[in-house]
């Protein structure tokens, strides 16, 4: 069983913000498998899917971004999923919009959702898919940028990368993180 976690913030006011692109990837995966999200045994929404004979839980924490670790640990414990079987999908403002980067492990890199997951797990060795939301952000408050909505032009780019992110996550499910990294990482990320 694999666990694919998309990070974001709950509440309608956060829909379609840069910070919620992880949620959008999970929604795309649920759409691809024609399933809806249900409330889990913890503070998360999830769906169970099967891809090429492999069981997958796709999950959206219903905590705020900086408390995402609680939902991840609850799902891991409930479904008995080891850390090696997890992929976390999150936004990254240091990667250009339209680019993605997969890693087998690493630091939080300033992403508070990842930071809390690392804190709760006590380790950094879980796979992550970072979705670029733009290097060309204005100087000043990063929080207002990541919590802001995409411009019309940016939205088109974001919408075009979401299916690729879902495909990369499914590649991880079938072939593992190394294969997904080799297939989907781009030089400009």
Curated annotation (Swiss-Prot):
* EC number(s) given by UniProt: 3.1.1.29
- Enzyme class per UniProt: hydrolase
Where is the site described as Discriminates between blocked and unblocked aminoacyl-tRNA found in this chain?
Answer: 9
List where in the cell it is found.
Cytoplasm
Q: Where does tRNA bind?
A: 14, 64, 66, 112
What SUPFAM superfamilies does this protein map onto? Peptidyl-tRNA hydrolase-like
Q: Which UniProt keywords apply?
A: Cytoplasm, Hydrolase, RNA-binding, tRNA-binding
- Entry annotation: catalytic residues: 19 (proton acceptor)
Q: List the record's Gene Ontology CC terms alphabetically.
A: cytoplasm
| UniProt-listed CDD domains | PTH
Residues annotated as transmembrane: none
Major site of localization recorded for this protein: cytoplasm
Site (Stabilizes the basic form of H active site to accept a proton) found at 91
Query: So what does this one do?
Result: Hydrolyzes ribosome-free peptidyl-tRNAs (with 1 or more amino acids incorporated), which drop off the ribosome during protein synthesis, or as a result of ribosome stalling. Catalyzes the release of premature peptidyl moieties from peptidyl-tRNA molecules trapped in stalled 50S ribosomal subunits, and thus maintains levels of free tRNAs and 50S ribosomes.
Please report which protein family the annotation says this sequence is part of. Belongs to the PTH family.
PANTHER family linked to this entry: PEPTIDYL-TRNA HYDROLASE
**Name of the featured protein:** Peptidyl-tRNA hydrolase
Q: Which organism is it from?
A: Chlorobium phaeobacteroides (strain BS1)
Lineage of producing organism: Bacteria, Pseudomonadati, Chlorobiota, Chlorobiia, Chlorobiales
Gene of origin?
Answer: pth
């Amino acid at each position: 069983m694999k666990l694919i976690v998309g990070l974001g913030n709950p509440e309608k006011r956060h829909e379609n913000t840069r910070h919620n692109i992880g949620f959008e990837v999970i929604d795309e995966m649920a759409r691809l498998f024609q399933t809806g999200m249900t409330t889990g045994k913890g503070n998360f929404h999830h769906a169970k899917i099967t891809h090429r004979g492999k069981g997958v839980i796709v999950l959206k924490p219903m905590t705020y971004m900086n408390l995402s670790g609680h939902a991840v640990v609850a799902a891991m414990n409930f479904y008995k999923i080891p850390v090696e079987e997890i992929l976390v999908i999150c936004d990254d403002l240091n990667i250009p919009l339209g680019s993605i980067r997969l890693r087998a492990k690493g630091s939080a890199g300033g992403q508070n959702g990842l930071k809390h997951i690392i804190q709760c797990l006590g380790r950094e060795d879980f796979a992550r898919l970072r979705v670029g939301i733009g290097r060309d952000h204005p100087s000043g408050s990063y929080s207002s940028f990541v919590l802001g909505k995409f411009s019309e032009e940016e939205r088109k780019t974001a919408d075009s990368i979401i299916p690729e992110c879902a495909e990369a996550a499914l590649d991880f499910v079938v072939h593992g993180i190394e294969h997904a990294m080799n297939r989907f990482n781009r030089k400009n990320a």
